[in-house]
Amino acid sequence: MLYRTWLVKGKAARYAWAALINADQTERLIYMKKILGAMRRCCEDFNMIAPGDRIAVGVSGGKDSMLLLTALAMYRDHMGIPFEVEAITLMTGIPVADYTPVAETCARLNVPCTLQPSDISEIVFNRRHEKNPCALCAKLRRGALNDIAVQHGCNKVALGHHRDDALETFLLSMFYEGRLHTFQPVTRLDRTGLTVIRPLLYISEKEIIGAARKLSLPIVQSTCPASGETKRQEMKEMLNAICRQIPTARQYMLNALKNTAQYGLWDKCRQDD
């Protein structure tokens, strides 16, 4: 019952805070209150979750997907919306990473877990020898994840993209594709009938790092050969440089993406109740 009070006001919240037993627990609660509050706003703004949904969470084992998994499990348990969550992990690395932390976290959260072996990295790096492997790898991973989600009877797939991911994608599209584009908060896939949702889009990478550290989330270390050497990393460094000069730049860029009064790239995602 304690977690539920993080998202409400009044006496219940005051009783919850009074029940805290030490400063470390207080700090963890503060982090998760902020994360869950931002996720709730995003879900409500774009109508991401409905009663009866069965949501497959794509879990790589990194900080973003592990926090998403944890937050969605809490959301399921304490928000009064009846929906199901399951985790799907594609084991794509060369060498194969240790995904024990994913399985253990799922067991703790009472979330079904599928660890699916895959030859995606073999295809991308050893057969195709891609010079820019990220796009093909992402496409293959999305396809495999969606296929498993359909097989398991899921109607939605949740991905751990956060605010910085959206802004970096926007910059990539401008500078390398010559178009104004980023991924949508909600995407409906005609081929599979699935809906892809991104509940963490109102949360910064810095906030995710802080929450993952405070919650002591176990993280699977990436074994990707291209890690840290991508165009996306260039955009991350560029965005950091911009924000050193303009500290509010990230928030204003996010506001621009959803500015319905002028040109909102995400406007078509909103639905009237």
Give names to the regions the model predicted.
Residues 9, 20, 24-168, 176, ...:
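ATP-dependent adenylation/nucleotidyltransferase module used to activate substrates
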Residues 85, 156, 164-244:
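Catalytic subdomain that performs nucleotidyl-dependent activation
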Residues 124-127, 231-232, 262-264:
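Short, solvent-exposed polar/charged micro-motifs at secondary-structure junctions
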